[in-house]
Structure formats: C-alpha cells, structure tokens
C-alpha cells in the first residue's frame, strides 16, 4: 500500500539520517535503499532528497565529500556527524512516542 507523502514528510530528515547511520552513501543509493526498505511504498522525489541534503548539511548534521570512482561519474557522498546522530536519536524518540499515542487514540485505549 503506497502511503501519502504528507504522512512521512515531517520525518524525511530522520529517514535519511537512518540510512547514513549504517554507512556513508550518495543520493541515488540512499533513495533506492529507502524504496527497498519500504517495499516500494515510499520513494522520495529527487528535489525533496537534495533539498533535505542541503538543509542537513547547512545545519551541521551531515557532511559531504566526493568519491573516487574509477568508472563512471563522480559521486557526492554524505556522512552523518555526531550532531546528526543526536538529531536522529531525538527524531526516533519523537516517532516512537507519536506511534504510541496514535495507536492509543486509534484503538481507543485509555
């Protein structure tokens, strides 16, 4: 089931940071990983992805560097910073709390 983009929109940065916790990566690879992890139900638009990269880099949450590809075009890699790790931890805690609250509200639990 494909979900509406607005359901995840506020969590785009956390989704990207989660991918970078695993290893440094470049835009296309990050987007393909997100698509694969979601079973094809969620894909970031390229403009959204690169706007998020700029915002995260400007905020000091990620850094970037050019890879040394022997074949093909050079790729810009992104790396999470310690500040980015902290932002991810905060976003994850907020997400977990949101899920708990929404489940309680939707299931009518007190």
PLM features: residue spans?
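N-terminal helix-turn-helix DNA-binding core of bacterial DNA-binding proteins
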Residues: 6-48
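Conserved amphipathic alpha-helical interaction elements at protein-protein interfaces in regulatory
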Residues: 22, 36, 40, 55-58, ...
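Short, hydrophobic-biased segments on the C-terminal half of alpha helices
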Residues: 50-54
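Beta-hairpin "wing" of winged helix-turn-helix
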Residues: 57-74, 79
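Amphipathic alpha-helical dimerization/coiled-coil segments
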Residues: 86-110
């Amino acid at each position: 089931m494909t979900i509406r983009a607005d359901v995840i929109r506020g969590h785009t940065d956390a989704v990207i940071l989660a991918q970078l916790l695993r290893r440094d990566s470049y835009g296309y690879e990050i987007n393909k990983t997100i698509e694969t992890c979601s079973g094809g139900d969620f894909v970031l638009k390229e403009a959204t992805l690169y706007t998020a990269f700029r915002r995260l880099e400007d905020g000091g949450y990620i850094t970037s560097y050019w890879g040394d590809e022997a074949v093909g075009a050079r790729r810009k890699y992104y790396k999470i910073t310690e500040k980015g790790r902290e932002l991810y931890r905060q976003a994850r805690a907020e997400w977990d709390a949101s899920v708990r609250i929404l489940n309680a509200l939707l299931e009518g639990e007190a």
